[in-house]
């Protein structure tokens, strides 16, 4: 996971360098250290998301009951805002995996580098290349097939983390416009 960086999806050198700088100052090394510790502990992959919450010292508080509000079988699409980046995915996967193991999250391809959760991720490639477009079409097909088989798909419909338009002003972060993919996927598969 040494190559774990979102900069690899950017095509120009300035963007790659900028992303690497932001990653450095926003805790990437700490996350890498925590992940390396996790690997040494030889924990069960089924508990990865719960273990990640513990390692990050996050206390997840919800206003619903997992076992009552998440169906134990049948296809389901979980649609969520993406306000906090990695924390959103870790939290949602922890909630879902406490009830079921037949789930996958549609997310950035770089996150598949974590071996413990590789099979839980349907990768999206944001590079915009011809190969990326073909891979993303395959990702959509994989999500459809998984839902038709009765699984759960977790999706962040804006496809991006909420951001501030001006980091120097006291504005709230805004979620990007939601893409139509989640709605189309629901209609195409009759998922809940």
Walk through the language-model features, giving the residues of each.
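Membrane-anchoring hydrophobic helices of lipid-metabolizing enzymes
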Residues: 1-79, 89-91, 100
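Soluble catalytic domains of membrane acyltransferases
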Residues: 56-192
């Amino acid at each position: 996971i040494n190559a774990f960086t979102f900069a690899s999806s950017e095509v120009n050198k300035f963007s790659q360098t900028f992303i690497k700088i932001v990653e450095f100052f926003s805790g990437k090394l700490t996350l890498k250290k925590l992940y390396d510790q996790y690997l040494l502990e030889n924990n069960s992959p089924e508990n990865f998301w719960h273990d990640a919450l513990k390692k990050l010292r996050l206390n997840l508080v919800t206003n619903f009951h997992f076992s009552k509000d998440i169906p134990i079988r049948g296809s389901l699409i979980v649609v969520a805002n993406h306000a906090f980046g990695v924390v959103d995915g870790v939290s949602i996967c922890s909630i879902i995996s406490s009830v079921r193991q037949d789930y996958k999250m549609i997310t950035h391809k770089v996150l598949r580098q974590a071996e413990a959760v590789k099979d839980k991720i349907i990768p999206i490639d944001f590079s915009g290349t011809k190969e990326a477009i073909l891979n993303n079409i395959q990702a959509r097909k994989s999500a459809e097939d998984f839902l038709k088989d009765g699984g759960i798909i977790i999706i962040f419909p804006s496809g991006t983390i909420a951001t501030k338009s001006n980091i120097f002003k006291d504005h709230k972060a805004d979620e990007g416009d939601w893409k139509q993919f989640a709605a189309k996927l629901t209609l195409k598969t009759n998922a809940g």
